[in-house]
């Protein structure tokens, strides 16, 4: 079973497309900047998994810039 589950993640960000975009951007940032992350520990070793864990923990949110 995958952690965190897609159902739990969609409670934080309502669109699966937005979820993928946010996770990919965060994972890329973590990789390029050698960022260790904002959580004390992670279950995943991969950057995308860490980004999804941050979303699940509420540390990473989507900001809408509707103008």
Swiss-Prot record:
SMART domains: RNA_pol_Rpb6 (SM01409). This is DNA-directed RNA polymerase subunit omega. It is an enzyme of class 2 (transferase). GO terms for cellular component: cytosolic DNA-directed RNA polymerase complex. Its EC number is 2.7.7.6. The keyword Mitochondrion does not apply. Pfam families: RNA_pol_Rpb6. The keyword Transcription applies.
């Amino acid at each position: 079973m995958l952690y965190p589950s897609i159902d739990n993640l969609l409670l934080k960000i309502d669109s699966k497309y937005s979820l993928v975009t946010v996770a990919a951007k965060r994972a890329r940032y973590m990789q390029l900047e050698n960022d260790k992350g904002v959580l004390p520990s992670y279950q995943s070793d991969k950057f995308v998994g860490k980004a999804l864990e941050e979303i699940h923990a509420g540390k990473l949110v989507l900001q809408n810039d509707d103008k």
